[in-house]
């Protein structure tokens, strides 16, 4: 079987259940609906008394519960039970091409592979083949290590992005797979998750074609320093950083395995998606600041971002101006009892958020406390920031006193890789790849710790 070591990829040995009912077996990524226990209760009802990946994961809504450790032990036992009781078909060495249609009518294409954690680095200014897209919060790794370290099975919700405008890797794999291979699964996903189909990718012809596409993509994504930036982590940054940390810990405890290219702990199962896939939406995550002087903020950002400001008459006009730009920002706030709209125009060439967030962080460090008087009395309160999905919510918040909503421009796919290559991982909450119910669902499994 062909190897793809130089591209940081390995053909995984994939496990699929014998009687695959996608609607009860597959579960949405554990880092979704973190404030919505009701969603996970509904998921439990959907999967009740049936084999399900829900029994193999710990939704992050429960990460701080007192019985977390008991839940992790139960997950391990369930994994062992599924392996012993013949829930799975025999493992098969293959890639899988998938098509995911969401409830929003979008179809996203993906390729399931294993990646070599030796070729991945989450730390800033990495020159690794596989790099993080957003700043990794180190404190989030240890609790996730407790779940992965020693687990008999791995389930992927990580999505890697490939910079492939010619659609050579994922899309071409799909054309060939659908033409000549059996369909592995097809069905609905629970709770409005849409539907999913998967095809085997394993013939020599397919492997040869994938190798050629990776060679071309490597050449096209070679940076000025000579490093190759082949894949960016789109979803699951902290999960992949956790997998890397577990592998580093394992090497320390088992130094004889440090160079073992067959050790399953060295790899992570992921889905590769083309950043240019029309079914993959990139939405900006907007900002809102509380308890600050809006005019002082705009003046400060205008200086730091070397821009110019323009008064805008209506909400619609401001929204359209920002939406049709890649580097302009919209502000909405109350002034003399009326809602005001201001456009900040800049000539930023990289992704706009990579310049805005550091400037906001600087402003918040020095922003004076606001003097507020209400029925509770008078007091000083400090400035705060929050991250908002959707422009409607920004304009609603902009109607509140002492509040400034900031609209961010669309995330430009064509400058995404270049920005990360030049500036390192993006600031926190930079972009969102679709809605919560569009995130990857757990479906395929792989043996991890024996």
Language-model features, listed with the residues they occupy:
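N-terminal extension/subdomain marker
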Residues: 1-193, 198-202, 215-221, 228, ...
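Non-catalytic terminal and connector segments of soluble metabolic enzymes
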Residues: 347-350
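Charged substrate- and nucleic-acid-binding regions of tRNA-handling and nucleotidyl-transfer enzymes
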Residues: 352-450
């Amino acid at each position: 079987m062909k190897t793809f070591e130089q591209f940081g990829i390995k053909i995984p040995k994939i496990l699929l259940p014998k009687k695959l009912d996608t609607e009860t077996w597959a579960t949405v990524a554990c880092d979704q609906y973190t404030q919505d226990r009701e969603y996970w209760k509904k998921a439990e009802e959907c999967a009740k008394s049936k084999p399900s990946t829900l029994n193999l994961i710990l939704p992050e809504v429960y990460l701080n519960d007192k019985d977390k450790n008991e839940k992790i032990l139960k997950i391990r036992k369930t994994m062992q039970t599924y392996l012993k009781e013949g829930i799975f078909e025999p493992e098969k060495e293959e890639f899988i091409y998938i098509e995911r249609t969401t409830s929003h009518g979008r179809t996203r294409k993906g390729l399931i592979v294993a990646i070599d954690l030796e070729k991945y680095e989450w730390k800033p200014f990495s020159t690794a083949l596989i790099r993080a897209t957003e700043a990794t919060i180190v404190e989030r790794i240890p609790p996730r290590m407790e779940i992965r370290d020693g687990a008999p099975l791995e389930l992927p919700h990580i999505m890697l992005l490939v910079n492939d405008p010619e659609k050579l890797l994922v899309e071409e794999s799909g054309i060939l797979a659908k033409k000549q291979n059996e369909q592995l699964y097809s069905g609905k996903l629970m709770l409005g998750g849409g539907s999913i189909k998967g095809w085997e990718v394993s013939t020599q012809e397919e492997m040869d074609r994938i190798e050629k596409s990776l060679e071309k993509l490597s050449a096209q994504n070679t940076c000025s320093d000579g490093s190759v930036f082949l894949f960016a982590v789109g979803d699951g940054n902290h999960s992949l950083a956790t997998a890397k940390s577990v592998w580093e810990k394992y090497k320390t405890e088992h130094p004889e395995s440090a160079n073992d290219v067959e050790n399953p702990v060295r790899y992570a199962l992921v889905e590769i998606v083309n950043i240019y896939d029309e079914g993959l939406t990139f939405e900006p995550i907007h900002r809102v600041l509380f308890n600050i002087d809006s005019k002082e903020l705009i003046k400060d950002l205008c200086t730091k971002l070397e821009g110019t400001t323009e008064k805008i008459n209506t909400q619609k006009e401001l929204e359209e101006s920002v939406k049709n730009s890649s580097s302009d920002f919209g502000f909405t706030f109350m002034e003399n009892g009326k809602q005001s709209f201001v456009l900040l125009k800049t000539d930023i060439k990289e992704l706009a958020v990579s310049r805005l967030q550091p400037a906001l962080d600087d402003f918040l460090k020095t922003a004076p406390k606001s003097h507020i008087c209400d029925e509770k009395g008078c007091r000083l309160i400090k400035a705060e920031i929050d991250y908002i999905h959707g422009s409607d919510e920004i304009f609603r918040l902009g109607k509140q006193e002492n509040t400034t909503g900031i609209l961010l421009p669309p995330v430009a796919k064509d400058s995404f890789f270049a920005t990360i290559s030049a500036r390192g991982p993006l600031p926190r909450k930079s972009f969102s790849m679709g809605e919560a119910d569009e995130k990857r669902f757990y479906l395929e499994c792989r043996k991890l710790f024996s």
